[in-house]
Amino acid sequence: MGPERGPPAGTAFRPTVCPMAESGASPLPEIPPPATVPGTPDSRSPLARAERFVWLTARVLEQRLFAYHFRGGDPGPVETALDAYRNEDGGYGHALEPELRGPVSQPLHTACALRVLDAVGRCGGQRAERVCRYLTSVSTPDGALPVTRAGRSGDPAAPFVPVVADPPGELLVTGPVVGLLHRNDVWHAWLFRATDFCWQAAESLVSPHPYEVEAALAFLDAAPDRPRAQAAADRLGRLVREQCLAVLDPDDLGGCPVPPGHGPGEH
C-alpha cells in the first residue's frame, strides 16, 4: 500500500464530524455553509451572518430559539432544550441565566424560562402550574420574589448578584414575572399577593434605578386594572424625564447621570 493521499490541491478541507459512538453523545451539528441555494438569504446579509454566529457560539437553547423565530422552526425543540435546565422542584437552574451558576433553582433562572415559554406560546397549562408552585415556595413573606436564594456554598455568581441567606423581595424579578403571567391569562393563588406587591412597589418609586422602572413597566403593561396601570405609567414617565434616567439625546450623554453600578458611558 502506498502513502495515504490528501485532498487534491485547491480543495478546501472539511473536518469529518465523528459519531462519538464510544461516549454515547450525539454528534455536533455541522456549521451551515454560506447560503447558495436560490431563494435563501445572501450569505452576506445580516440574517445569514447572525445565523452563522449563533451556530458558532450559542447554546442549544438559543439555536432552537433562532430556528423558531427566523427559520419557521417548531416550538417543541425549544421546550425540549429548555427542559434540560428544569429541576424537580419546578424551578430552573444550571446557569440558564448566566449571571448565576450551579444547578440550584433560582428565581432569575425561572424568570428567564418563563420568557422563553412566552416567546414560543407555551406559557400556560401544567407548565405554568409547575412554575407557580415553585414561585410560591421561594416567595418572601410579602409575596414577592427575591433576586436570588441561598444555594450551595461556593456556586459562582456575578458580583452584582449577591447570594444572601435571607434576601428581600424585589420588584426587579417580581414585576416581569407577574406581568408575563397576567399577559398569558395565567391564574394561580401565588399571583394575588405578588400582584399586590407589584402595585405597591411600582406606585411608591421615588428615586428609582432605571432597572426598577423597566421592571415596573413590565408589570404595568399587563396589569389587569388598566386605568390604574396607565396612571402609574404616566407618573413613572414624568420621573424618568425629571430625573434624566434615560438618554433622550444621544449627542448629549453628559446631560444624564450614569446609573449606580454602571461604568462611564453606560447610560
Give the label of every model feature segment.
Residues 15, 20-267:
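Preference for long, amphipathic alpha-helical scaffolds in soluble/luminal domains
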